[in-house]
Amino acid sequence: MCRQCTAMGIIKSRGKIMAKFYLIGKISQDLMQRMQNDPSADRYASTKKVTEAAGLKLISYEWVRGRFDVISCVEGEYEQAVALKITFKNSGLMDDLMVHEVIDYNKAFTNAANAANSVIKPGK
């Protein structure tokens, strides 16, 4: 696997091309209360367990300041990342959870440049 592919989030595992995703979430009031009641709870371990159960590999898991509370990086397939989102949302632990796939921006903008050549503006 090339260095550029790895930098763009393309990972090869057991002969399959895997993607890299960032999940950015806001925890629920229920989880916030549970965390306050048991501040030593190992959220990393429980997050890793459910992530792996969805078929993903947990790369990182961080609590952050700001509009959102947690950011994690996972490797796998898109459907697996969506399954993880559904699982967390249905558990009531997360109020909001976004899934962002790492893309090859050079390829995206090359495709956009090619598509732009076919745009015909009205009156031209």
Residue ranges of predicted features:
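A compositional/biophysical signature of low hydrophobicity enriched in polar/charged and small residues
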Residues: 14-124
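Short, Lys/Arg-enriched N-terminal segments with co-localized hydrophobic residues
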Residues: 1-17
